[in-house]
């Protein structure tokens, strides 16, 4: 089955960072995502979804270094169900997201202080990708731009290529 979650929201608390016995970093964050909609009576409604997110490796360390309560981020990952027994013996469960990539959406702060120094950050944020292995992490910077999809330094006059569909190998 396909399990993919993409969510944008704001941190509900500061990042909680700890290290696993293997030495890999694990960060837990709370995320709130708002949805505004029009009710049947025409008034505006809003619902908020709260969910915990787990980040591993370098992404966890970057989140701890740069994110604070209220920071806006985009998370791509997979939905997980955690189950446990509480102190009274009752079975409890909750959904969490295990992050595979994180993108900071807040712009750089103005003034002399720049917490993004010595990183691959741009005005639109920073993106970190991780796979499930704590020992394998990749960092990619996002291209410079105004953050809108479909913009950038792309050629304007792209010639049309005449290829028969049977020549395409897939």
Swiss-Prot record:
The keyword DNA-binding applies. Residues 88-170 are annotated as: Disordered. Keywords: DNA damage, DNA recombination, DNA repair, DNA replication, DNA-binding. Residues 1-106 form the SSB domain. Homotetramer. HAMAP family: SSB. This is Single-stranded DNA-binding protein. It comes from Helicobacter hepaticus (strain ATCC 51449 / 3B1). The gene is ssb.
